[in-house]
Swiss-Prot record:
Belongs to the class-V pyridoxal-phosphate-dependent aminotransferase family. MOCOS subfamily. Sulfurates the molybdenum cofactor. Sulfation of molybdenum is essential for xanthine dehydrogenase (XDH) and aldehyde oxidase (ADO) enzymes in which molybdenum cofactor is liganded by 1 oxygen and 1 sulfur atom in active form. This is Molybdenum cofactor sulfurase. InterPro entries: Aminotrans_V_dom, MoCF_Sase_C, MoCo_sulfurase, MOCOS_middle, PyrdxlP-dep_Trfase, PyrdxlP-dep_Trfase_major. GO terms for biological process: Mo-molybdopterin cofactor biosynthetic process. The gene is hxB. Coiled coil: none annotated. Keywords: Molybdenum cofactor biosynthesis, Pyridoxal phosphate, Transferase. Pfam families: Aminotran_5 (PF00266), MOSC (PF03473), MOSC_N (PF03476). It catalyses: Mo-molybdopterin + L-cysteine + AH2 = thio-Mo-molybdopterin + L-alanine + A + H2O. Gene3D superfamilies: Type I PLP-dependent aspartate aminotransferase-like (Major domain).
Length: 778
């Protein structure tokens, strides 16, 4: 008997209550967080870790390649667990073998490595929704094709995607059971239809990693199953970090030409006067599991299977629960409207109604956000704010280039142009030529709850829904041309990137260079291992590193305001001189540094005392590096600031007047040559300026929304120049600077062009005096 909607909802809410009841005990790490990145990995329960720890301290497990009692115990447990995992996926051990691998990608690579050693190689076709790891197989193939849904259907109808279908070369067809980008699911019977429909030997590779996160995988019909299935267990259980390649025994021949062999996979090796070896032949996994298996991870898998069932029941229960939550999330995001009626979210995932059409989708909702005027909201800005509010989501290309290109309408030439313009995976350049380059992905898992969905929808509505009825943006009232209307309240430089600022003494002349204020962000701290420039975003104690310029002694004096051991020096001095002897030799092998995703060639100090000072106070192995003005090539950077969407009204020549205004330059376009403005180690522009009236207004808004919170100090914005009205009786409108095209400063009327609003990251929530984070304020 079919359940009614009310009955289904009742079951779903009861199951949700069950999950809610175990969250605090089993997932204490989720307290204060809303975790919505289960498609990446799911959190692990406390009872699993407790059980694993007990297992490890109660038994002695040896290397399974030995004959000792501890080794035989490991071997027996591994084989029992191998069988248990096959049964978990309804795979008959007489029809399938399971090979333990590091993750799904390792399983994919194992298949590709085997097929490329075939006498004539192999041809490869893959679905456009494939994960990057599936796409990479094309580099090993003789020929490769990317297929969309229609092209797969044509193939199933009898048309081989490769021109010459009489060749003996085998074909490998790969596709995801579920897209990791939007949750769309693809027919598992494609594997059977492809194999039966063609004249060439065709193998099928199913990427089940995204599907098995929250749904059962049924391999009970061996003849209809894929030849190779890959998955990662940490996506199901959170722990252990382990994957599997499940091979249909009828397809084992694909590995016959594999050349490499590792320890434990051979019965005999001759290497002195002859080169010969005898691979193990009883089971395929014995030939493919090179070296010592991750014994402890496999044993942890046994505990993971037990605990998961105890907590959540069957995978069908998990699938039903996550489908219920996913439909709720999708529907509520779809219904969000701005005050003018425009949709807040553009959704790319299939809607819950597709289940009625014979399709299905996983618990993944991918979308982008538009403001009330239709402009795209930056993914980087969404992720930064989400991080501040305790949400864990995924943004960007999510390792699915074909799915992203299809959803966003990105042609290959556009993606190449974006790359040439500086777009890279992980950078903040997420809107290029008016189009987003990625998506926001929220994915749900077994321990997700209705309250998680409620909180996330409320977050989107609070920060991105414009409830005002009028879609028009109120233009600022033109101000009279009065260069004395403002004065500089304070001026600061930040000699070491992401560390405390140095306030320029009042009345002091200060040089303005093409790269910005002299000495500003000329030094940085880089991680010894990666070369990545350190930032307060990850290392908030950098706010307690206080640089001061001492021109009389020619030194940069650096002190630390935090707690230190008694023997640790509290201050160190660094010469301002660029004497080459201070730095590591350019000829020595050293990793280049990275700042905001850019590769730079900075000069790292050779002094152990200097580098140890910073490493000790931060607890991070780091080096002090210098990036002086006037460099070339990788010793030079350029501004990336640009007008934000809310400032596009500034593009016409008729801009509002501003203090000491000067005619604006014409807007940049794709065809116009842009002016390349040099910067040192600042994120986007040579100089950052704010006004005190805007900070005052921000504090007023914070007080209205959350009374009792401490005021925000202007220091958190880390501005070089803080401006305030010259005459207190002539106030400046808050946020008036958003409408300026530039300012003129000083008796000589030095011109400063406004490049764009600063996309300040969540460093604004770090108290610059105490290094404490206060995410609730902003």
């Amino acid at each position: 008997m079919a359940r009614t909607d009310d009955q289904a909802k009742s079951v779903d809410t009861r199951y949700n209550a069950r999950v809610e009841s175990l969250r605090d005990k089993e997932y204490p790490m989720l307290n204060g967080s809303i975790y919505l990145d289960h498609a990446g990995t799911t959190p692990y329960p406390k009872s699993l870790m407790d059980r694993f720890a007990k297992e490890m301290t109660s038994n002695l497990f040896g290397n399974p390649h030995s004959a000792s009692a501890s080794s035989q115990l490991s071997t027996a447990r591994i084989e029992d667990i191998r069988l248990r995992v096959l049964r978990f996926f309804n795979a008959d051990p007489a029809e399938f073998d399971l090979v333990f691998v590091a993750n799904a990608t390792a399983g994919i690579k194992l298949v590709a490595d085997a097929l490329r050693t075939a006498p004539d190689g192999f041809d490869y076709s893959y679905h456009q929704a494939s994960h990057t790891s599936l796409i990479g197989v094309r580099e090993e193939a003789r020929n490769s094709l990317c297929l969309d849904d229609q092209e797969v259907d044509d193939w199933l109808g009898g048309g081989c995607p490769f021109e010459n279908d009489s060749e003996d070369r085998p074909v490998l067809f790969a596709y995801p059971a579920q897209s990791n980008m939007d949750g769309r699911r693809y027919p598992l019977n494609w594997a059977e239809k492809v194999c039966r429909g063609g004249t060439r030997k065709t193998y099928t590779l199913l990427d089940a990693a995204a599907l098995v996160c929250s749904s059962p995988l049924d391999l009970s019909q061996a003849n209809a199953a894929p030849d190779f299935t890959v998955l990662s267990f940490y996506k199901i259980f959170g722990f252990p970090d382990l994957g599997a390649l499940i091979v249909r025994r009828d397809a084992e021949e694909a590995f016959d030409t594999r050349r490499y062999f590792g320890g434990g996979t051979v019965d005999m090796v001759v290497c002195l006067k002859e080169q010969w070896h005898a691979p193990k032949a009883q089971f395929l996994h014995e030939r493919l599991e090179d070296g010592t298996l991750p014994v402890h991870s496999i044993i942890a898998l046994d505990a993971a299977l037990d605990v998961h069932k105890q907590l959540f029941g069957s995978m069908r229960d998990v699938a039903s629960h996550t489908a219920f939550l996913s439909a709720m999330l999708y529907t509520r995001l779809e219904l969000l409207r701005h005050g003018n009626g425009q949709s807040v979210c553009v959704l790319y995932s299939p809607g819950p109604e597709t289940a009625n059409n014979g399709l299905s989708s996983g618990p993944v909702v991918s979308f982008n956000i538009r403001n009330s005027q239709g402009a795209w909201i930056s993914l980087a800005e969404v992720e930064k704010l989400a991080t501040l509010k305790g949400f864990h989501i995924r943004t960007g290309g999510v390792c699915n280039p074909g799915g992203i290109a299809s959803a966003l309408g990105l042609e290959p030439w556009e993606m190449r142009r974006n790359f040439s313009s500086g777009f890279r995976c992980g950078t903040d350049l997420d809107i290029m030529a008016g189009k987003p380059t990625g998506v926001i992905r929220a994915s749900l898992g077994a321990m997700s709850t209705i309250s998680d969905v409620d909180s996330f929808v409320e977050f989107i509505a609070e920060f991105y829904r414009d409830a005002s009825l009028s879609p028009a943006r109120t233009e600022p009232v033109p101000q009279p041309h009065d260069p004395s209307r403002l004065r500089i309240h304070s001026m600061s430089i930040y000699p070491i990137k992401s560390c405390c600022g140095f306030q320029v003494p009042s009345g002091t002349d200060w040089e303005v260079r093409p790269e910005g204020l002299a000495w500003d962000r000329e030094w940085c701290l880089v991680h010894q291992g990666t070369g990545q420039a350190l930032s307060q975003k990850r290392h908030s104690k950098m706010a307690l590193i206080r640089p001061a310029l001492d021109f009389e002694r020619g030194q940069l004096r650096v002190s630390y305001a935090g707690e230190l051991p008694a023997h640790q020096p509290r201050e160190i001095s660094i010469p301002l001189s660029k004497n080459p002897s201070l730095f590591r030799s350019s000829s020595s092998r050293s990793r280049s540094s990275r700042v905001c995703g850019e590769e730079i060639q900075a000069q790292t100090y050779s002094s152990t005392a200097i580098n140890s000072f910073f490493s000790d106070v931060l607890g991070v192995p780091c080096l002090l590096a210098r990036f002086p003005a006037g460099g070339h090539g990788k010793s030079m950077r350029h501004s990336k600031a640009h007008l934000q969407k809310h400032q596009l009204s500034l593009l016409p020549t008729a801009r509002p007047a501003l203090p000491g205004s000067f005619p604006p330059s014409p807007p940049d376009s794709d065809t116009e040559k842009t002016v390349s403005r040099r910067i040192l180690l600042s994120n986007e522009s040579p100089i950052l300026a704010i006004t005190l009236p805007s900070v005052t207004e921000l504090n007023r808004e914070i007080h209205l929304s959350k009374p009792g919170l401490k005021e925000v100090s202007p220091a958190v914005f880390r501005a070089n120049i803080v401006m305030t009205p010259a005459d207190p009786d002539v106030p400046l409108a808050p946020y008036a600077e958003d409408s300026w095209s530039g300012i003129k400063v000083g008796p000589q009327q030095h011109e400063f062009e406004m490049l764009g609003a600063c996309r300040r990251c969540h460093m604004v929530c770090i108290n610059q005096e105490t290094a404490e984070r206060a995410r609730s304020r902003l």
